[in-house]
């Protein structure tokens, strides 16, 4: 993981040959980036040691977010400056509402989570705040603001 960095992206490129924009963002976010990547929850998901009950709760919470993420993408498709950007975002939206949604449904079935549970689940306060930020930035903000918030959603 990149070490802490507080300079510009140009400075980062000069000090890190072959460095990528995402490397610079992660370096600027230290130590929080490493803390998130090494958090016990993140590690347990990655190595398969997450208890099924905890994973089911996580999936239910994440599923409450998917509807708002789909709406966010809809706003951004509408605001995208041209057909290439609209196509890329609508492709993501199609994937989210088909294959990713199917993953959730298969997972809920495998974990024994009844449809009434995940269909009526309320968002927790952190998810709700993040969803509201996404919807506000993409619906009321500029295209760039919406994309910036979308990036953070996809990295979390």
Give the role of each language-model region:
Residues 2-5, 119:
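Surface/interface-facing alpha-helical segments and adjacent flexible terminal/loop regions used
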Residues 2, 12, 17-21, 26-28, ...:
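Hydrophobic alpha-helical segments
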Residues 5-9, 26-50, 69:
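Short alpha-helical hairpin
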Residues 13, 84-156:
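Active-site-proximal alpha-helical scaffolds that flank and shape metal-associated catalytic sites
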Residues 19, 23, 31, 39-40, ...:
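Generic alpha-helical secondary structure signal
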Residues 12-21, 46-56, 139-141:
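Short, charged, low-complexity loops and linkers
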Residues 30-35, 49-79, 98-99, 147-156:
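Alpha-helical bundle segments that constitute or directly flank the non-heme di-iron/ferroxidase center
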């Amino acid at each position: 993981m990149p070490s802490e960095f507080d300079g510009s992206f140009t400075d980062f490129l000069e000090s890190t040959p072959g460095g990528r924009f995402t490397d610079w963002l992660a370096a600027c976010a230290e130590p929080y980036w490493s803390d998130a990547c090494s958090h016990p929850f993140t590690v347990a998901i990655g190595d398969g040691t997450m208890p099924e009950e905890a994973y089911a709760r996580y999936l239910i919470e994440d599923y409450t977010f998917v509807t708002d993420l789909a709406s966010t993408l809809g706003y951004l498709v509408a605001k995208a400056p041209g057909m290439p950007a609209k196509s890329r975002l609508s492709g993501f939206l199609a994937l989210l509402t088909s294959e990713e949604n199917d993953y959730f449904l298969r997972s809920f079935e495998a974990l024994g989570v009844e449809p009434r549970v995940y269909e009526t689940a309320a968002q927790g306060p952190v998810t709700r705040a993040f969803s509201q930020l996404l919807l506000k930035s993409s619906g009321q903000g500029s295209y760039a603001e919406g994309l910036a918030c979308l990036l953070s959603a996809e990295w979390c």
